[in-house]
Amino acid sequence: MKLLIAGGGTGGHVFPALAIAQEWLSRGAEREVVLVGTQRGIEMKLVPAAGLPLETIRVAGLKGKGGTRLVKNLAMLGSGLSDAFGVLKRHSPAVAFGVGGYAAGPMLLAAWMKGIPNVIFEPNAEPGLTNKVLARLAKRIATGYEISARAWGEKAAVTGCPVRPEFFTIPAHAAGKPFRLLVTGGSQGALPINRTFVEAAALLAARKSELQIVHQTGERDYNHVRAAYAREEIQAEVLPFLTNMAERFAWADAIVCRAGAITAAEVAAAGRAAVFIPFGRATDSHQLRNAQEMSNAGAGRLISESELTAVRLTREIFFLLDQPREIEAMARKARSLARPGAAREIVNLIEAAARPGGKSGPANGQRDAVGT
């Protein structure tokens, strides 16, 4: 039985896809999987590296586009749908699973039109545009947060976000000196975070003997950030990209990071305190909602991009330095939110959708059966 997993673009889409693929394949030698993305996404590196087959389709985003770019991207929808039908013809999957990202839309629409059952995954507290549309076509919806599940009623199940297993084996936090701070803005880095740390370096230098920093910058800002720490003689390891993220989480006392759903889930799985700086222009402000959920639960602190300054950032870091009990409380609360069975629960939903009688779509006369 073959599972098709559609979506990608960022690690936040691809890592859950890989976790689901691994769980699916672990359930029997007869299981097969194929992943579908685009040629521009990080899946082009991560999926082959995991030893899994990858197909690509032509597609581009629509939200936030205008003028000639919007016209061009609209024209690509037809090409993407044509490519998607080709993928279905080559692989004949029993069920399709969408993890979000540009490829998920046309791929799951094509699957639905062919009567292949769909399951989608919405990791964020605020659902994205693609999943808002695909939810009408899906048999089941797996969500990362209770708040996003409410909109879809009984069709939705709160599973949590699939996280790589090594995050769950990280030992409980044990304080040490100097204070170990991990800074990460995702696979490409985060310009506002990098820029603010550069500006804050002179302020952080006042307590540099108490600090040890690992800062993942992305390629673009690497030299600039490294020079700022060196100028102030702050003990910092600056890297464009981190390949051993679970080990870095285990090392850290606290993490400064974005608030993508998978990042938040990794913070929870690792049981670490965090300062979340959500992407200010993320579609539908989903990162802000994720950060609010974690902050409201006592599992992290929140700085919005509009409030992000060198002074505010330094104040948050010095607060953590001075409040070891707060660090421990946030770490415990974060780990209490972890969902180690997320991949298993999602694959259970996929299997249920794939059982006889589980098909949907126009080929089975059920075009409007969802959400009515």
Q: What residue spans do the PLM features occupy?
A:
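Glycosyltransferases and closely related glycan-assembly transferases
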Residues: 83-97, 103-119, 132-136
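Active-site-proximal region of nucleotide-activated glycan assembly enzymes
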Residues: 112-170
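Donor-nucleotide binding loops and adjacent catalytic segments primarily
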Residues: 41, 46, 50, 172-255, ...
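Acidic donor-binding loop of glycosyltransferase active sites
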Residues: 93-95, 250-265, 272-273, 318
